[in-house]
Amino acid sequence: MAKYFDVHPENPQPRSIGQIADAVRSGALIAYPTDSCYALGCRLGSRDGIDRIRSIRRLDHRHHFTLMCRDFAQLGQFVRVDNDVFRAVKASTPGSYTFILPATREVPRMLQHPKKKTVGVRIPDHVVTQALLAELGEPLLSSTLLLPDEEEPLTQGWEIKDRLDHVVDAVVDSGDCGTEPTTVVDFSGGEAEIVRRGAGDTSRFE
């Protein structure tokens, strides 16, 4: 059964955040809220976590996983960003955007796109997620919690606990969450290519 953490949306309890971070460090797969919608997350490089996310969402090997980063300094450790792209990404973070960029050697090969050697990165504008990332001290490997054959992500922590109780290790609930995933922008070719229109405004990239 998954552990259930009821976390205050504006003033996250340090004890709960610490317990969630400890669980992630120990290999747990968690469901947690973001500024766009709920996500599945595990420790960077957790083969078991990656396999479980693929199984829950029925993803193939071409799926771009996302590294949920605390800030731009951390993001820069895992992707290569030239000056023009830097300005565009910097102006849009934190926020509901995922950027696909060339991966550095810090990113395990199993997380990189098999041909492009890219990875998704983002910096969330969400108090609870930021508290968890600060406590964890490293990015969370993440994927939108969108179940197969469903059009929208789940929005309520209790519903996620009820439906995924035996396939995730912890559920973080900080109240109602959105249903719209991030806007995905691919900068791996140098120019902005909008891969998915979502919660983030796309006009600045068009």
PLM-predicted stretches and their roles:
Residues M1-E206:
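Active-site-adjacent structural elements in enzyme catalytic cores
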